[in-house]
Design a protein with these regions (language model features):
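Primarily single-stranded nucleic-acid-binding OB-fold modules
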Residues: 1-176
């Protein structure tokens, strides 16, 4: 299951297999109890805090104690990282005025992460979309910018792209 919510009532206990984080995940439609093992706690300490918005991949399991269900967290992302993980690209509408791509990429470069396979660049590619309409004719083109134009999709980065887009139209595309 892929879920998003605000972390609350976080507590860490010593379980049979090491430390265990137990918390509630609230998306304003329901509150689910969730658990994360010690490895998950250590890898995501900066995200597993009260009042933090997180996106999680979790397995739903029966809860022996309450008789309900509990989420067993398998992966955790903050919002910009989830945009990066699940987004395909950023579509920026341009009509007659190109955004300052070089400056935006310099200000919001992709994040570098070391993995077992080597260095990984975490960022979204950018596509510029141009549309022209006439009385009887309409045309549209989309230009995929190269790997050098990848950027990390933080809130500030998205605001900057939106500010330079035609009529503020810029969107992350998640499915093609």
């Amino acid at each position: 299951q892929l879920l998003a919510g605000i972390v609350s009532d976080l507590r860490i206990i010593n379980g049979q297999r090491g430390k265990l984080a137990i918390f509630k995940l609230d998306d304003k439609s329901a509150v689910m109890e969730a658990t994360a093992d010690e490895a998950m706690i250590n890898a995501n300490r900066h995200l597993l805090k009260d009042d933090e918005l997180v996106i999680v991949m979790a397995k739903m399991q029966a809860d022996r104690f309450s008789g309900g269900y509990r989420l067993s967290i398998q992966q955790v992302w903050d919002l910009p990282s989830a945009r990066c993980r699940f987004g395909k690209f950023l579509r920026v509408y341009v009509n007659g005025r190109a955004p300052e791509v070089a400056r935006l990429v310099k200000d919001f470069p992709p994040q570098r992460e070391m993995t077992e396979q080597g260095e990984l660049l975490r960022g979204l590619p950018v596509r510029l979309k141009l549309e022209r309409r006439g009385d009887k004719v309409a045309a549209a083109a989309e230009l995929l910018l190269g790997e050098q134009a990848k950027f990390f999709p933080s809130d500030a980065a998205l605001s900057s792209w939106i500010a330079q887009a035609d009529q503020g139209k810029a969107e992350i595309v998640y499915e093609i």
